[in-house]
Amino acid sequence: MKVNVHDPRGEELAQVLTRATAALAQVPSPRVDAELLAAHLLYDGSRSRLQHAALMGERLTPAQVAEYEALVARRAAREPLQHITGCAPFYRLELSVGPGVFVPRPETELLVEEALKVLSARAESATGQLRVVDLCAGSGAIAAAIKSELPNAQVFAVELSEEAIPYARKNLEPLGVHLVQGDALTALTELAGTIDAVLSNPPYIPPANVPADPEAALHDPDMALYGGGEDGMQMPTAIAARAYELLAPGGFFMMEHDDTQEEAVAELLGRVGFERCYPVRDLNGRPRHSAGYKPATSGS
C-alpha cells in the first residue's frame, strides 16, 4: 500500500481506508479488517467512531498513516487480525489473545449457549454452588463466558500450554476463575465426582485436514488443532473419559468436534457411559458439538 501525502494537513481517513481495503483484497473481509485495524490504532477499538471520523473528513498525519500501513501489511500477509489487535470478541467479551494461543471461534459460542441453558436450569434447583470445568481452555474463552453469565458458579479452567497460560490468566483472573496449568487428563483429581458440567473445545482435527485458512494453519498452535490418530479422535476420546470421571452423577458434558466426527463422538460418549446424548448443530446445520449426561445413579 503506497502512500503519497502532498497535503500538509495530512491525508483523508476515508482515502486511507479505501487504499487499505484494496491492499487486503485477499483476506476474507477486507473492508471490515481495514476498519478494525484503524479503529484499534486510532479510536480505542471503536469502529463506529472510526466510521464517523471518516464521514466527517478527518485527516491522518503521515506518521499515523505509516503506522497504519504497517498493521495493514501484517494483515495482508495473513497474520490473524486478533494477533495484531491483541483481542478477540467472544460471547459479549473481549479476550486477550496473541501468538501461541488458539483464537476463539464463533462456533464455540454455541457450546456456551447450550451449556448455559443446562446450567441455568440446574442452578434453580441446586442446593450449593455449581461447579464447572473447562478442559483444554486455551485463552479461557469458555470458562470466561460461563463465569461472566453465572458469577456465582465455581469455574475451573485447565490448560497445559506455556504460551497460552499468560493469555488465559489475563482473561480469567479478573473474573475469579480458578486457572490450573496442567494436563487436562490428570488435573483436578481432588474434584473427581463433584463437577456439575465439564465443557471442552479440545484439539480434534484429523492430521490430513490441514485448515485452508493461513491464519489457522500457520498461526494457531498445532497442539490446539490436531487431535491425534488418523481420525483426530485420540484427544477427544481421552477428554470424554476424563470428563466422566470428574462429573458428579447427573452431570453434563459437552464437547466441540469436527463436523465429520458426529458418529464417532456419539459412539464414544455411549461407550464411556454417557446417556441422553445429542448433537448440537451450527447455523449451517453441521454437527459441531455433542453433549450428554453422566447417569444420575450407578444403576441407570
Predicted regions and their residues:
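Soluble or luminal CAZymes and related metallo-dependent hydrolases
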Residues: 12, 16, 63-64, 160, ...
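Conserved class I S-adenosyl-L-methionine
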Residues: 127-136
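Conserved AdoMet
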Residues: 39-118
